[in-house]
Regions:
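Adenine nucleotide-associated cytosolic modules
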Residues: 1-185
């Protein structure tokens, strides 16, 4: 299973998957923990501030269940690296915080023929959607995104970046609940 995003949603998802005994995890995140993460990201602690989220996640998995094989990618996902990141995966879990990367990941999962589990939060609200390879609608169609059927060129990317603006405050239980449900799916 590949989990893309090791922050609020992803941290909880990763911990639950490790506790459930999932044998192999691929963890992806380019960010490092900072002080603002402590209120909602269960993998974050004072001693981890400034450290790469994917590296911290790997160590936490090792402490929970040393039998889980963990591979990490400390990089941003884009069209050039997504296939490499998910090449060994049977499932991709989206714990991302931006629409453009979700489109890239969802397209790659559909092309590979594997489930894409989407999770997102906004303030005190959250959502989960599971897209199977044979799902009637894609992620882009479900949310009526301006990228439907289009190449991800500069114009389409700009349109996707304009879909969401501003990040509302998030309290800890919201990403943790969504992360647990993603692991359950």
């Amino acid at each position: 299973i590949t989990v893309i995003g090791c922050g609020g949603i992803g941290g909880e998802t990763i911990e639950m998957l490790a506790r459930m005994g999932i044998g192999e995890l691929v963890l992806v995140d380019k960010d490092a923990f900072d002080l603002s993460n402590l209120n909602r990201q269960t993998l974050a602690s004072i001693k981890d501030l400034g450290l790469d989220k994917s590296a911290v996640a790997k160590e936490k998995v090792r402490l929970i269940n040393p039998y889980v094989k963990v591979t990490t990618f400390n990089e941003h996902i884009d069209q050039t690296n997504i296939k490499k990141v998910i090449e060994t995966s049977d499932i991709v879990i989206d714990a991302l915080d931006n629409v453009l990367t979700r489109v890239i990941v969802s397209r790659a999962a559909k092309e590979k023929g594997i489930p894409y589990i989407h999770g997102a939060i906004h303030g005190t609200m959250g959502q989960i959607t599971v897209f199977l390879p044979n799902s009637e609608k894609t992620y882009e169609e479900m949310f009526n995104l301006p990228s439907i059927g289009k190449e991800l060129n500069e114009e389409t990317i700009d349109a996707l970046k304009n879909v969401t603006s501003g990040v509302p405050p998030v309290i800890g239980p919201t990403p943790n609940l969504i992360g647990c449900i993603e692991a359950f799916e």
